[in-house]
């Protein structure tokens, strides 16, 4: 696993900390990994939907 260093606004990291404290995630790293996974999955889904829509055409009569 690669290490990545990033800056996150204080308000957002405080929200991540609350999620860890309430047991939603075991630690901050896992919370951030989960957010990245969700974002990537959403991007892939959106791309597939756009590709599917662009392949549709008018029915030949």
Swiss-Prot record:
Keyword annotations: Cell cycle, Cell division, Cytoplasm, DNA-binding, Transcription, Transcription regulation
UniProt protein name: Transcriptional regulator CdrS
Lineage per the UniProt record: Archaea, Methanobacteriati, Methanobacteriota, Stenosarchaea group, Halobacteria
Any one GO molecular-function label of the UniProt entry: DNA binding
Protein family membership: Belongs to the CdrS family.
Places the protein is found: Cytoplasm
InterPro entries for this protein: Arc_rbn_hlx_hlx, CopG, Ribbon_hlx_hlx
Induction details: Part of the cdrS-ftsZ2 operon.
Organism of origin: Haloferax volcanii (strain ATCC 29605 / DSM 3757 / JCM 8879 / NBRC 14742 / NCIMB 2012 / VKM B-1768 / DS2) (Halobacterium volcanii)
GO (cellular component) term, any one: cytoplasm
Span list, region Disordered: 40-61
Classification via Gene3D superfamilies: Met repressor-like
GO biological process: cell division; regulation of DNA-templated transcription
CDD domains: RHH_NikR_HicB-like
Compositional bias ranges of the Basic and acidic residues kind: 40-54
Domain of life: Archaea
Chain's role: Transcriptional regulator which plays a central role in the regulation of cell division. Controls expression of the gene encoding the cell division protein FtsZ1, and of genes linked to other metabolic and regulatory processes, including synthesis of signaling molecules and protein degradation. Acts by binding to the promoter region upstream of the target genes. Is probably part of a regulatory network that controls the cell division apparatus and other downstream gene products in response to several conditions or stresses and via other transcription regulators.
Null allele phenotype: Essential, it cannot be deleted. Repression of the cdrS-ftsZ2 mRNA causes slow growth and cell division defects and changes the expression of multiple genes and their products associated with cell division, protein degradation and metabolism. Repression of cdrS expression alone has a severe impact on cell size and morphology.
Keyword Zinc-finger in record: no
Signal sequence bounds: none
Gene: cdrS
């Amino acid at each position: 696993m690669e290490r990545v260093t990033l800056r996150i606004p204080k308000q957002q990291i405080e929200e991540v900390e609350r999620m860890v404290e309430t047991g939603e995630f075991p630690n901050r790293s896992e919370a951030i990994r989960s957010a990245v996974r969700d974002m990537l999955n959403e991007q892939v889904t959106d791309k597939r939907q756009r590709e599917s829509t662009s392949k549709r055409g008018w029915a030949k009569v």
